[in-house]
Swiss-Prot record:
Cellular localization per UniProt: Mitochondrion
Positions of modified residues (Phosphoserine): S41, S125, S657
Gene Ontology cellular-component annotations: mitochondrion
Catalytic reaction equation(s): Hydrolysis of terminal non-reducing beta-D-fructofuranoside residues in beta-D-fructofuranosides
Tissue-specificity statement: Expressed in seedlings, roots and flowers.
Entry annotated with the keyword Phosphoprotein: yes
Top-level taxon: Eukaryota
Name assigned to this protein: Alkaline/neutral invertase C, mitochondrial
InterPro entries, A to Z: 6-hairpin_glycosidase_sf (IPR008928), 6hp_glycosidase-like_sf (IPR012341), Glyco_hydro_100 (IPR024746)
Keywords attached to this entry: Carbohydrate metabolism, Glycosidase, Hydrolase, Mitochondrion, Phosphoprotein, Transit peptide
Protein's gene: INVC
Length: 664
């Protein structure tokens, strides 16, 4: 039997400093040999690295005469230590893009040397991280050793789920509808492999699409519903791989027009590419090509990517029981870098994040620049996730304190100033303006004339919602679904406000759900508003795309919010509406018209997060007990640091919208 060789090159590309003890580290899942058979240990030492002078990434090189290969696991000896080396052999199936030569892409930093870490444990600068730059090259040929195929997403056999058993495929299929069966087939067909291991799902996988644009990439926000669907189905490997690979991409040098953003920025997307190796016929290497917004329409920075990454990291631990991932030094450092970027001091007087238009799911010009609700809700959720996962020590105490302070201030700000119901709108209608005082009622100098005519008749007597944006002399009264749902899921709103959001959706079902759940925002910008605010965007015409279009991917978030608020039947109703049409309409990205009757005029078909959103919603309905792992209840400890609690006025705290005592 002819054996083929594999070459793997792993070159870390950090933006800060990393430290790993060589003697006890288990980088890539094995202990390095004492002998110099494969590695020159003299070159493996701790060093400070300037990110501006390094441009390297994780590459997986394979030498294969044909490109049909799948992963084999062979046990060989590395200087006396056991290890697995995956070699190219045989043929691949599905969307396999490569052969993984090293079982785990990122290192297991938890097996570090205590002595090596002691000198850095008291480092007060939480942005500091330490890494040992490594380049591993291995060429080995072995035969007759038992092999095991890896990288399959479907059976869940390789998922790291502890004592949680994986359901048999036959039992699972018996309980699935035809729509679900097709959805699972499509979702698994959208999986992208890197070096033989699944690392994500493409944005869309329409076989009839001749112009893929960037829909053949793995987007962080798009992959989140796919990750939830896989984990709820007992498959965690793809999520773990995704989290680790995107973490490595975080450290890449990011430059657009000679300017580099902060090192904590996560990419909007990445793509697996391959390039031929010089001097080797038939051999090539795979590499990840990230996009940090430099190729996006409008060149917008993906602010929400890092927030989604932290949220997904927590969900991975909750659903799989594998908390070792979030405890790793490299992962802990990734969390800190994102937090540093979000908590950086600036000119803003508010605890909300100031962003440009198009920096989240609404990624085109839609008048959401400033402090959009979607970003604030995800920011709050990410802060709560990070606070749970951060390992508290002398080096992180100041960061944890900053997180707690921001959580308290942010929840107060959103609950107090973003919330509207019939009572609040009537209050705004009677506002005095031009108030110059620290105790002013109309703190943002909102003119009553800003209340739109549609809102006066639309707002129900019961219920309410969080407005889309707030800035001086400006309130965006549009209802943005994703932001309101995450306000409920994360308990950014208090109990009454969360109930009010769900009541409003139920009351305004014909506007927000109708023929296809759910409206991304309501109402649409029309006529002069559309021309001025969107710049006459031909894709965001009224009741289309982000301007009032209906997006089925929001189903899973709606289902999670419904389960939290005890409205499971409402979620089932919405899923049933979608299930009637999605398969027939070929899983479109979005729907047009006020009631969501038409498939979007520029909608991609077989959109992965449409498929995954539907499947995740179905799984949550089947397993509502798991939903409790994914949402948050009110944190009453935050109320102790409320600014109202610091007031000398004893009665002021009772009036604070953040304070809603727990129900008996």
């Amino acid at each position: 039997m002819n054996s083929r060789s594999c070459i793997c090159v792993s070159a870390m590309k950090p933006c800060c400093r990393f430290l790993i003890s060589f003697r006890s580290s288990s980088l890539f899942g094995f202990s390095p040999p004492n002998s110099g058979k494969f590695i020159n240990s003299s070159k493996l030492h701790c060093t400070k690295i300037d990110s501006r002078s390094i441009r390297s990434g994780i590459h997986c090189r394979r030498i294969v005469l044909d490109r049909n290969a799948f992963c084999d696991s062979d046990s060989i000896s590395w200087g006396g230590g056991g290890s697995r080396v995956l070699r190219a052999r045989g043929s691949s199936r599905g969307r396999g893009r490569g052969v993984l030569v090293i079982p785990h892409v990122a290192s297991d930093f938890r097996n570090y040397s205590t002595s090596s870490l002691d000198s850095h444990v008291n480092d007060k600068s939480f942005e500091s991280m330490f890494v040992k730059p490594l380049v591993f090259k291995e060429v080995e040929k072995t035969e007759g050793i038992p092999k095991r195929e890896r990288g399959n997403v479907g059976g869940g056999k390789d998922a790291n789920f502890g004592n949680v058993g994986v359901r048999k495929e036959t039992e699972r299929c018996l309980s699935q509808t035809e729509v679900e069966k097709e959805a699972w087939k499509l979702l698994r067909g959208a999986v992208v492999n890197y070096c033989g291991f699944p690392v994500g799902t493409v944005a869309a996988n329409d076989p009839g699409d001749t112009q893929t644009l960037n829909y053949d990439q793995v987007f962080i926000r798009d992959f989140v519903p796919s990750a939830y669907a896989f984990m709820l189905d007992g498959e965690g490997e793809i999520v773990r791989n995704f989290l680790l690979h995107t973490l490595q991409l975080q450290s890449w040098e990011k430059t657009v027009d000679c300017h580099s953003p902060g090192p904590g920025l996560m990419p909007a997307s990445f793509k697996v590419k391959s390039a031929p190796l010089e001097g080797n016929d038939g051999s090539f290497e795979e590499f990840l090509d990230p996009d940090f917004g430099g190729s996006a329409i409008g060149r917008v920075s993906p602010v929400d990517s890092g927030l989604w990454w932290i949220i997904l990291l927590r969900a991975y631990g909750k659903l799989t029981g594998d908390y070792t991932l979030q405890e790793r030094i490299d992962v802990q450092t990734g969390i800190k870098l994102i937090l540093k970027l979000c908590l950086a001091d600036g000119f803003d007087m508010f605890p909300t994040l100031l962003v440009t238009d198009g920096s989240c799911m609404v990624d085109r010009r839609m008048g959401i620049h400033g402090h959009p609700l979607e970003i604030q809700a995800l920011f709050y959720s990410a802060l709560r996730c990070a606070r749970e996962m951060l390992i508290v020590n002398d080096g992180t105490k100041s960061l944890v304190t900053a997180v707690n302070n921001r959580l308290s201030a942010l929840s107060f700000h959103i609950r107090e100033y973003y919330w509207v119901d019939i009572k609040k709108i009537n209050e705004i209608y009677r506002y005095n303006t031009e108030e110059y005082s620290a105790d002013a009622t109309n703190k943002f100098n909102i003119y009553p004339e800003q209340i739109p005519t549609w809102l006066v008749d639309w707002i129900p007597d019961k219920g309410g919602y969080f407005i889309g944006n707030l800035q001086p002399a400006h309130m965006d009264f549009r209802f943005f679904t994703l932001g309101n749902l995450w306000a409920v899921i994360s308990s950014l709103g208090n109990q009454e406000q969360n109930e009010g959001v769900m009541t409003l959706i139920e009351e305004k079902w014909d506007d927000l759900v109708a023929n296809m759940p759910l409206k991304i925002c309501f109402p649409a910008l029309e006529k002069d508003e559309w021309r001025i605010i969107t710049g006459s965007d031909p894709k965001n015409t009224p009741w289309s795309y982000h301007n009032g279009g209906s997006w089925p991917t929001l189903l899973w978030q709606f289902t999670l919010a419904c389960i939290k608020m005890g409205k499971l039947e409402l979620a089932k109703k919405a899923v049933a509406v979608a299930e009637k049409r999605l398969k027939e309409d070929e899983w479109p990205e979005y729907y047009d018209t006020k009631s969501g009757r038409f498939v979007g005029k520029q909608s991609r078909l077989y959109q992965t997060w449409t498929i995954a959103g539907f499947l995740a919603a179905k799984k949550l309905i089947e397993q509502p007990e798991k939903a409790s792992l994914l949402f948050w209840e009110e944190d009453y400890q935050l109320l102790e640091t409320c600014v109202c609690g610091l007031s000398k006025s004893s009665g002021r705290k009772n009036k604070c919208s953040r304070f809603t005592p727990p129900r008996s």
